[in-house]
Structure formats: C-alpha cells, structure tokens
C-alpha cells in the first residue's frame, strides 16, 4: 500500500523545495529567521513582511518544508504504524497544511512582487485540498483492508489526478520563484529535504 502514497509524495515533491542564496554569505541562518518570524506572529494577525528578499523566500520555503516533513512522516507510517497511528499521522499532516495556508495568506508582497506569494498560496491551498480529499480517501481504503483490482484502479486514478493538478501548480510556483530570484540577483539551490525525499 505504501507505494500508492509514495507516488503521491513524489508528485507533491517535484523540485519546488528550493532555497535562494545571495552571492555573499549571510550570518543569520534560515531557521533562526523563520523561528523569530513564527514567534512574532503567534498572536499576531497583521500582514507579515520582510526587509530582505532571501528572508522572504526562505519564509515561504520553510512553510512548504514543514508540510513536506509531515508528508514524509505519513509515508513512513504506512510501513510501521497501526491504523490509529496512521490516522494520527494523517491528522498531523492536515493540521500543518491548514496552519501553513493561514500563515502564507498573511504574507505581504515584496517590493511590489505578489506573484511568488500568490503561487505559493495556490500550492498551499492544494495541500489542504489533498488532505481533505485524496489522502483521506487513500487512507480510508488502506485501513478498510479491501484491496482488489477495482480498488487498485481507483487508487491509481486518485494519484494520477493529484499528480496532474500538482504539476501545474508546482510549475507555476517554480517559475514565480525563479522570477523573484532573478529580480533580486539571487540563485536557487536545491533544498536538503529534496534529497531526503529522493532517498525514500
């Protein structure tokens, strides 16, 4: 059963999980910046803004990474968890997906650029949609234990539909991120999380 969700994970991962680097090294780590930002916003509903383009990018990518980490945990859970633990892992993913969507919706533009944020919002909304729809359906099927040719075809169809939609959203996100990087004289590098996904 794991391979069905793993295929879905691959569809979700693509290569959008990237960081942007400036030509010179920055002393502040991404995690420190994000943790500071998250602490500030815990009880804040104001628009979130950044004075640095790299911090702006890293904030978006960190939100995405948080969701991916929950997806990876869920995929691993398929091999090692009982039904109760699987449901709990699924719920954790959902909570993170919903939380990150709320957070990205609070993010302002960066020097007039709204496209990067907007494409990220579309992608994060998709994570919530997958949680409420495709993942729930797949997990319900697996927990039911009723696996036959008809069920397998149904699962394959779900995965194909998710993959098709995600590909379009992810491509749009990557284009927007690249444009943002170009506008701000920065380079995109692969996120370490992508390597972890590739090694699953």
Where are these regions (language model features)?
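Positively charged n-region of N-terminal signal peptides that target proteins for export
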Residues: 1-4
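C-terminal motif of bacterial Sec signal peptides marking the signal peptidase cleavage site
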Residues: 13-16
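Immediate post-signal-peptide N-terminus of mature secreted/exported proteins
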Residues: 20-91, 191-200
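Short, charged/polar, low-complexity loop and linker segments
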Residues: 42-47, 73-77, 99-112, 146-155
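Short, charged, amphipathic alpha-helical segments
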Residues: 86-94, 117-122, 149-161
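Short, solvent-exposed, charged loop/turn and helix-capping segments
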Residues: 100-122, 139-142, 177, 184
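Long, charged all-alpha helical bundle/coiled-coil segments in cytosolic proteins
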Residues: 119-126, 130-136
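A charged, solvent-exposed segment within the mature domains of Sec-exported extracytoplasmic proteins
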Residues: 133-200
């Amino acid at each position: 059963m794991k391979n069905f969700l793993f295929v879905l994970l691959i569809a979700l991962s693509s290569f959008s999980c990237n960081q942007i680097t400036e030509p010179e090294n920055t002393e502040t780590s991404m995690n420190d910046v994000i943790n500071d930002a998250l602490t500030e916003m815990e009880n804040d509903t104001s628009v979130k803004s950044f004075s640095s383009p790299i911090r702006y990018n890293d904030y978006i990518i960190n939100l995405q990474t948080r969701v991916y980490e929950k997806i990876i945990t869920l995929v691993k859970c398929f091999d090692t968890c009982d039904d109760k633990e699987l449901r709990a892992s699924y719920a954790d993913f959902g909570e993170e997906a919903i939380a990150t969507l709320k957070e990205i919706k609070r993010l302002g533009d960066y020097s007039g650029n709204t496209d990067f944020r907007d494409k990220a919002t579309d992608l994060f909304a998709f994570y919530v949609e997958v949680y409420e729809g495709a993942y729930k359906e797949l997990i319900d099927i697996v927990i039911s234990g009723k696996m036959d040719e008809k069920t397998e075809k149904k699962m394959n169809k779900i995965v194909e539909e998710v993959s098709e939609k995600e590909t379009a959203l992810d491509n749009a996100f990557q284009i927007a991120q690249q444009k943002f990087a170009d506008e701000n004289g920065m380079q995109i590098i692969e996120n370490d999380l992508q390597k972890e996904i590739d090694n699953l």
